[in-house]
Design a protein with these regions (language model features):
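Catalytic cysteine-centered active-site loop
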Residues: 24, 28-78, 89
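Glycine-rich phosphate-binding loop
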Residues: 81
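Soluble non-cytosolic domains of exported or imported proteins
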Residues: 9-16, 36-41, 70, 129
């Protein structure tokens, strides 16, 4: 368990439930335009997970990027959303979204997302390659005082 996550916030239990719920879908296949539960695209997966806890996010990663409050990379917490450019839309246009599940003492993190090639998987960040080059920013959707 991350001590960092619980310090100064009441939402630790909610975040843990969110992470546990998301992890139940590891291995679920990717399908463009799908919002679960048998297949997901990236924004469909994030929307599905958050909706289960009463947070209604818009359907696309590019519109989800305009929700919540901006978070600096060094301040990432479990439950935060990370946004990346897509394959074909240029480096500044959001085309992919993931949710932070763990933050390590060195500032690296692990996120869960629906990958086009692997379905729902965990991914370390920074990865020294694909996701590091495409990272755009992060947002916090869940308020510090949100309860489970």
């Amino acid at each position: 368990e991350s001590v960092e996550q619980a310090s100064g916030t009441d939402n630790g239990e909610l975040i843990n439930q969110l992470k546990d719920f998301a992890s139940k879908y590891l291995g679920t296949r990717y399908r463009r335009g799908s919002a679960g539960p048998k297949a997901f695209d990236c924004s469909g997966f994030i929307g599905f997970v958050f909706k289960n806890f009463g947070f209604n996010l818009s359907r696309s990663s590019s519109t989800q990027y305009h929700e919540g409050e901006k978070v600096e990379t060094g301040d990432l917490r479990p439950g935060d959303l990370m946004f990346f450019s897509g394959r074909g839309g240029g480096r500044s246009r959001v085309g992919h979204v993931a949710m932070v599940v763990d933050v390590n003492p060195d500032g690296s993190c692990v996120f869960i997302h629906a990958s086009t090639s692997q379905g729902v998987v965990y991914q370390k960040f920074p990865d020294g390659g694909y996701y590091s080059k495409r990272y755009i920013g992060a947002k916090r959707i869940i308020p510090a005082d949100a309860k489970a």
